[in-house]
Amino acid sequence: MNDACFSIVAKDCARDELLVRARRKGDIEKVFPKAKVKRNAKADYLYRARIKKDVVVAALKGEVDRITYSNFKSSVTDAKLHAAYLRVWGNLGPLQENWDEWPMFKEF
């Protein structure tokens, strides 16, 4: 997503739920406004919410339907999130075949 970043796993929740985890306050609520988000200072992801699977599916479908951009990185307006995504993009680049042949990517 271009305005929030979180992880979704099937951990520590009921069979009909998923655990949505985020590092930044507010990211979960951007997509799941009714979520009961808890902060856990001892966890690698500070913010967590158990959310029903059908709610997750509907929300993610809504996010897909909302896509209008032709370039993901250019659509991210939050500077801190953009910088994080850019680092991930650069780190994943070498997984692509012939990545090192692209001169513009030599800096990564």
Residue spans for each PLM region:
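Structured alpha/beta or helical-core interaction and ligand-binding surfaces enriched in interleaved
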Residues: 1-108
